[in-house]
């Protein structure tokens, strides 16, 4: 039985709502623009620390950005 949960996100929508570019958000949380792009496209799941930093930078709750 393969019940692997896949973390999905609304990061792009939340970022655009704040009128931030990928590069600007990346600078705010201390990662590369490529990392933000990879999270937005589901190619990379952020660590708990990075997810928290993204929530703080976007002034959103975890469940507003990330879901299963």
Predicted regions and their residues:
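A short, Lys/Arg-rich alpha-helix, primarily the initiator
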Residues: 1-17
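Conserved hydrophobic/aromatic packing and binding residues within compact polymer-binding modules
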Residues: 11, 25-26, 36-39, 65
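Alpha-helical residues within the helix-turn-helix
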Residues: 16, 27, 56
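Central "turn" residue of the DNA-binding helix-turn-helix
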Residues: 19, 30, 41-42, 59
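Short alpha-helical DNA-recognition segment
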Residues: 19-35
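DNA major-groove recognition helix of helix-turn-helix/homeodomain DNA-binding modules
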Residues: 49-64
């Amino acid at each position: 039985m393969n019940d692997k949960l896949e973390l999905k996100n609304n990061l792009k929508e939340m970022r655009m709502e704040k009128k931030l570019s990928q590069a600007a958000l990346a600078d705010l949380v201390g990662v590369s623009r490529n990392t933000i792009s990879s999270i937005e496209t589901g190619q990379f799941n952020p660590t708990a620390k990075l997810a928290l930093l993204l929530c703080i930078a976007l002034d959103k709750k975890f469940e507003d950005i990330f879901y299963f």
